[in-house]
């Protein structure tokens, strides 16, 4: 769940023709050497609600336990939404390593491979829904693009080019079912963020709220976004619950917009 500025930047790149958009049946050069380099010294892996749900399936922990142990929460600087960044383990040599990185026979592997975060699963592909600059309908349906990388960071890209190793997009991103779930999740979340922006971006409403009110609102949103899915067992159950929670979140934001004193009710619920 990247912040708004990054998505706007991608939309601008798309409009300028600077992104290499790939269709499901297209191929791209890549070979994973299992070097573990992309799983170290990172601070940019954002966990969205679907990622956190999948990590509960992989670890057997509750949503809150996953966030507390494997996440770092912060407020999106432009979205004003609670975001969760993947936490890394500090090593004796000063490096940081993903908690889910394992090693076997000299090769690194992901301990939660079947449920790894979407950003990790699709690398070196990125995902974009290019929105119009005026916030209107998307210019592009959810699509994958090849991230620019010259091979200095990932040796697998160099090897794939030299040995002509290709991957099909739809297979690499987890198949049609994974793509279906991801797209539905994205549609639900996009509808919510559009509404949230209308509630609070106009006239800088969020910035004009006092710090306590901001904290209460963000706390309530964080619970709705990330923590209400412990009894979900399948992707479709998660999607149904997520849609319901985002409708509740929109209603809550509308109440806060219409009646600032509604924050007091939220504080009482939280207490």
Language-model features, listed with the residues they occupy:
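Short loop/turn segments that flank or connect secondary-structure elements
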Residues: 1-271
